[in-house]
Structures are given as C-alpha cells and as structure tokens.
C-alpha cells in the first residue's frame, strides 16, 4: 500500500470504526510520511470508540472522505490521550450490509470463479488486488482452491480491514479545531465564564468540534449571538 496502489480509490457506504487500540503499521508503510497510513497489520481491537457508515477515499496522504472526517476528531482525541502511541487503529468493513455468513454464501455460489473476479463484485478492482496480495494468493486463483485459513482471513479483511491513523491534516486544512475553553466552565445560557465574571466565550474559543455538515458554524453563530447579547447587557449593568 505504501506504493500508493490505492490512491484515488473511493468506497461507497463503508463502515469505518475507531478502536481504543494502537495501530501497528508494517515496516514499509511506516516509511510513508502521510498523516494517515494504511497498514497491513494492526493490534487486536479491544473496544470500539465510534463507527460511521459513509463514503471514504484513499488519497495521496492517506485516507479521507465523509466517514474519515467524522472519525478524525475521535482519532485525535485518542492520540492526545495516548502520547506513547504512534498511531490509532481504524478498521473498515467494505460490505457492512452483509454478514460474514452472507459473504460466504455468495462466494460459495461462485466458488469456481477466480478470486479477483469474485472480489470485484464487492470492492473496486485495485482494492481487490490488494486483498489478494494480503492473502498471498494469485488473483487468478479459483476461490474453491483457497484453504480454510485463507478464507477466514479474507472475511476478516473484508469486514475489518486495518488502517493506522498517525494524525490528521494540518490546521490550515482542517474543517474545525478541537480544544479550547471547556463548556463545563461556561454558563450555557449566557456564555459567561463561571471562573471570571464579565468574561464571555463563543465559537472557536470553546472546546466544541462537531461533525461536518454545518454543525460547527451553527454552534459559532448561536454562541456568538448569546455571548454578544449578554456581554452588552453586562456592560450596561456595570455602567449603572
């Protein structure tokens, strides 16, 4: 994957899960200097933090798209809480609407087909070739020739393909920032600080980072309006 064989491949309606676990990129993928690095192997998942079923795309720097953007904040929070970790583990289910049993049934129905041909009914050809590579099986191999272990590994890759996220894009390319003044320290009715009287916060000053889709700008407008109104009223009160 480090040779960018998946660059530009887009996936529709996949399920991306962020795990409470460190990703472990292969030696070759560690050499890639992107913010998000596809990995061959990852540590065993322990607890799922969040799952988003949307579109995603492999890019020149790693991976992106609606599902990844929604997961990115959780990845950054996990990495911040685990400074000793080099990356955070994500997995992708390429066919979330199908169970492994259903995938197996479809495969058995076409067991005489070449593995590449079979995989192309579920994923784009370039991704299918990567899956064959991960299995160590030639693309033209008939599905019926796979061993039980290879079939089991295939379904694991199809439903939990591991990716290691080492971080997000730099601030100038971000959609929203995280961090700031804790909302627990602000009166939500007035946006006034609970610690310093007469000090009001709004927008990016607050530790609010919602999903893309207008939520962040709405939060900025609403908190800005409230903070502005109550700051003005507070000023009038102080003037007597």
Where are these regions (language model features)?
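An anion/pyrophosphate-binding glycine-rich loop and adjacent beta-alpha core
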Residues: 1-145
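Short, basic, low-complexity termini and linkers enriched in Ser/Thr/Gly/Pro
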Residues: 27, 238-240
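Short hydrophobic core segments
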Residues: 56-61, 199-201, 224
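Short, flexible micro-motifs
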Residues: 65-68, 76, 182-183, 206, ...
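Predominant activation on well-ordered alpha-helical scaffold segments within soluble catalytic domains
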Residues: 69, 152-155, 159, 222-232
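Domain-scale detector for complete catalytic domains at protein termini or as standalone homologs
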Residues: 89, 115-121, 166, 184-185, ...
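A glycine-rich dinucleotide-binding beta-alpha-beta segment and adjacent secondary-structure elements
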Residues: 129-209
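A conserved FAD-binding loop/helix module that cradles the flavin
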Residues: 208-238
């Amino acid at each position: 994957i480090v040779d960018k064989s998946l660059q530009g491949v887009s996936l529709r309606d996949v399920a991306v899960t962020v795990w409470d676990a460190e990703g472990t990129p292969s030696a070759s993928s560690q050499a890639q200097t992107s913010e998000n690095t596809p990995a061959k192997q990852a540590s065993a998942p322990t607890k799922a933090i969040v799952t988003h079923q949307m579109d995603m795309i492999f890019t020149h720097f790693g991976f992106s798209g609606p599902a990844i953007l929604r997961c990115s904040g959780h990845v950054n929070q996990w990495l911040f809480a685990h400074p000793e970790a080099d990356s955070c583990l994500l997995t992708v289910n390429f066919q979330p609407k199908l169970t492994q049993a259903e995938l197996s049934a479809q495969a058995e129905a076409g067991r005489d087909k070449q593995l590449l041909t079979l995989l192309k009914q579920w994923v784009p050809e370039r991704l299918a070739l990567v899956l064959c590579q991960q299995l160590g099986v030639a693309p033209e191999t008939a599905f019926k020739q796979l061993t039980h272990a290879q079939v089991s590994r295939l379904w694991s890759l199809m439903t939990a393909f591991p990716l290691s996220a080492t971080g997000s894009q730099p601030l100038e390319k971000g959609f929203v920032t995280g961090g700031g003044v804790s909302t627990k320290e602000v009166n939500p009715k007035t946006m006034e600080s609970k610690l310093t009287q007469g000090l009001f916060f709004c927008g990016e000053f607050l530790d609010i980072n919602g999903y893309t889709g207008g939520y962040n700008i709405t939060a900025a407008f609403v908190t800005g309006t409230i903070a502005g109104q109550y700051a003005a009223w507070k000023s009038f009160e102080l003037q007597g």
